[in-house]
C-alpha cells in the first residue's frame, strides 16, 4: 500500500454536520477499498486568492491515507461527482525508504 494525501476545498455554505457526512463518505470509500485513513486535518475556513464558483472563501480539509494505487481513481471519481467539493488535489507521499536516502 502507498500513502497518499488529498487536499479538498469545500463549499463555505456547508454546515459542520453536512461536512462531517461528506468526509464520512470519503473515508468509507477508502476503507471499502481495503485502505486506512491516517489523518484528517481540518484547516478551516480560509480566504481564496480568486473566486471559486462565486465564493471568496472555502473550507479546507487534508486527508492522509494508505491505499492501493488503483483505488485512488475510485476515490477521485467519488470526489468529482460529490456536490460541495469545489476543488481537490491528490499527491503520492514519499515512502519511508526514499526519505531516509
UniProtKB/Swiss-Prot annotation:
SUPFAM superfamilies the UniProt entry points to: Ribosomal protein S6 (SSF54995)
Q: What does this protein do?
A: Binds together with bS18 to 16S ribosomal RNA.
A biological-process GO annotation: translation
**What is the name listed in the Swiss-Prot or TrEMBL entry for this protein?**
Small ribosomal subunit protein bS6
Against PANTHER family, the record matches this protein to: MITOCHONDRIAL 28S RIBOSOMAL PROTEIN S6, SMALL RIBOSOMAL SUBUNIT PROTEIN BS6M
**Pfam families with a match to the protein in the record:** Ribosomal_S6
> InterPro entries, per this entry?
Ribosomal_bS6, Ribosomal_bS6_sf, Ribosomal_S6_plastid/chlpt, Transl_elong_EF1B/ribsomal_bS6
Q: Does the keyword Transferase apply?
A: no
GO cellular component terms, A-Z? cytoplasm; ribonucleoprotein complex; ribosome
